[in-house]
């Protein structure tokens, strides 16, 4: 059986959860899931999928480093990239063509993923430290999002994740 890889960068864990959900729909290959920071032997995979979350408007530096370091092997494989961010909760910003973070990312890198996905993430106010909690609350207030810091808000559209996964034909 062929092997596929999903490697991810996450701050609070939602991108890992989405990666695991994508792997559940694999019927043509076995899927390994590793953090992007792991030292991964990419050559043994037929397909490489990268998932990355946004925090304060940016992907983590490890995402850019991974892509730069591995662009040749990424280009030689079936590949995909998906972005996880809370702005994608808005219908006008939840596609690869309309999501500002994904658009900016693709302009900054040389790699051109063959498949793209954008998924809304999750806000876990009770889990956050004081500074993060109130910085995110302020951002949510500005963007007319939820601001009750006693609650968790999951915006991920799991049917959209399933559709993306099935289109990858893993």
Where are the regions that the model predicts?
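Generic beta-sheet signal
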Residues: 4, 47-50
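Compositionally biased, disordered extreme N-termini, encompassing classical targeting presequences
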Residues: 1-2, 75
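Short acidic low-complexity segments
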Residues: 32-43
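FMN-binding flavodoxin-like domain, especially the glycine-rich phosphate-binding loop
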Residues: 25-32, 47-48, 55-170
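Structured loop/turn residues at secondary-structure junctions
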Residues: 10, 54-55
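N-terminal beta1-alpha1 ligand-phosphate binding loop
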Residues: 2-27
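Structured loop/turn residues at beta-strand edges in well-structured enzyme cores
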Residues: 2, 43, 111
């Amino acid at each position: 059986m062929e092997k596929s890889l999903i490697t991810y960068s996450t701050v609070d864990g939602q991108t890992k959860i989405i990666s695991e959900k994508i792997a559940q729909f694999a019927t043509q290959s076995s899927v390994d899931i590793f953090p992007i920071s792991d030292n991964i032997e990419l050559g043994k995979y037929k397909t490489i999928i990268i998932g990355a979350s946004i925090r304060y408007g940016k992907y983590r530096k490890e995402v850019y480093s991974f892509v730069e370091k591995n662009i040749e092997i990424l280009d030689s494989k079936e590949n995909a990239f998906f972005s996880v961010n809370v702005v994608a909760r808005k219908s006008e910003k939840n596609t690869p063509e309309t999501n500002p973070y994904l658009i900016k990312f693709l302009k900054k890198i040389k790699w051109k993923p063959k498949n793209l996905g954008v998924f809304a993430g999750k806000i876990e106010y009770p889990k956050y430290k004081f500074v993060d909690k109130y910085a995110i609350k302020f951002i949510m207030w500005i963007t007319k999002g939820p601001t009750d810091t006693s609650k968790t808000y999951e915006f991920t559209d799991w049917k959209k994740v399933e559709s993306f996964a099935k289109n990858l034909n893993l």
